[in-house]
Amino acid sequence: MPPRKKKEAQPEDMKSILWKSADKLRGSLDAAEYKHFVLGLVFLKYVSAAMEEKRAQLEEGLRPGGWLLADLGFDGEPPAAAVPQILEDRELYTGAGIFYVPPTARWEVVLERAKGTLDDPTLGKVIDTAMETIEKFNTSLKKGTLPQQYNSGRVDETTLAGLVKLLDRLTFQAQVGEDGQRVGARDLMGEVYEYFLAQFALQEGRKGGEYFTPPSVVRLLVEMLEPEEGERVLDPACGSGGMFVQAEKFVETHGGDRMNVAVYGQERNLTTWRLAHMNLAIHGIEVDLGEEPADSFHNDQHGGLKADVVLANPPFNISDWGGEQLGLDDRWAYGTPPVGNANFAWMQHMVSKFAPGGRAGIVLANGSMSSKSGGEGDIRRAMVEDDLVACMVALPGQLFRSTQIPACLWFLGEGKGRHSKWVPGRKGEVLFIDARELGVMASRTERVLTEEELGRIAGTFRAWRGGEGEGLGLYEDVPGFCRSVSLDELRKHEFMLTPGRYVGVAEAAVDPDAEPVEERVTRLAKELLGLFEESGRLEGVLREQLGRVS
């Protein structure tokens, strides 16, 4: 019997293998630290594989009649001695959006050292040198972008070698999906990288929310803002860059050229800034993340930028943002935000970045819709009176792993009802959507918005603003879900922007499939017991971590 052909790993298999690789490090590092070791190696594995894939294409192009011969000025086959030089021509790779990886920095060198077939230096030193070399040969990567801590001793050589050999089992070559369409290596690796970021964020809990926004929330922001080809997109609190990935997917899905979208981001945390660089590089997204990691309030890396689309999920209700140092900043056009809460500082910073007709979507704590402390009520009133607020969405609970604080979405539009193509005919009106009852539980502790629900929310907004699309129809208020409210009514309610105040109560209806009360109580009791179990597990993890540092 002929030997059975080795089955190529599928994306789901890759994700499972990657997560096992993280487990190999868990014994010595916590989630916040080990993600950088693992994701850095994933990046190194990917850039080497992507270059090999491109190298194979170049070799094909150098054969008789190949596409590359004429481009290089050859009438026939190139001299044999010239072929190796051509295949190492850096511009042939970087010009195609592929990182050039010098021979000494390639994955096979790292793998051979991990297997013990190469002598000193240490494996950690080999990896650090590879990262440094890749930065040096690719000008799109600023110095210090890639992690270079593998020789620090925080991970022993045996564990590191096991991780390298485990990652070597992955294949990042292009595949054919179930629908028969070719899925590129970059798309596959992008999926794996995003999945891994999500898993690390889950492990880190609250801290993970600093660099990761739930995909369904990102999707909703992008679907409602509708970025287009040729526009400039900014995220002043970009985390690992997930907003940009989804924005470019939206442009491409709607027939635009995703390469013709200018992307700008800023992130203050060095390690998260590195994660964003690697994440966006794997997705093939050219981005300007500034010269260095920096705080958007005090060291704006894009001072003169005017953007068409601004979106962000900044940290909720932060009090240590240094507001007392800014005073009467030019950005505070609607009022000076309170020193003890940055919510309205984030909004005004984003609005200050608007190009004519600019639009923004921002995730904030629910308190931003009704708080009057520190002058927030006056700032909110000024924004509404200036017809800046287009739509408010109250989100369901448990969407965010990192916080139990209820959240909402603000959608702002410059010139709404005047020259804005985004919301051209709704001057003096605000759309309120109450989505608190939507979503399904993906686990005992996490809720997600379904495709249908995302379509319902975004479609309602699109119909309200007069957009076009299949099945949109005319906008109508739906009791308990959405309502368009005039400026006069908002004045009567002192500019409170909580959707539940305006949309009313859904019409009572007898649902034959409704869950009986006894069954509901039983189910909720089981869910509560599950939460108790999860709490016990997390307490054990915390005690273990405290034991290591004590």
Which residue ranges define each predicted feature?
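Hydrophobic alpha-helix feature that most strongly marks membrane-spanning transmembrane helices
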Residues: 252, 281, 285, 315, ...
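Non-catalytic, mostly N-terminal accessory regions of nucleic-acid modification and defense proteins
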Residues: 1-229, 288-301, 394-397, 415, ...
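C-terminal, active-site-flanking charged/polar segments
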Residues: 59, 388-389, 399-462
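Short, contiguous acidic/charged loop-to-helix segments that flank catalytic cores in large enzymes
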Residues: 28, 321-341, 366-375, 396-402, ...
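Hydrophobic alpha-helical scaffolding
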Residues: 153, 182, 237, 265-269, ...
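Conserved Class I SAM-dependent methyltransferase catalytic core
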Residues: 24, 33-46, 273, 291, ...
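Conserved S-adenosyl-L-methionine
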Residues: 207-312, 317-321, 325-328, 333, ...
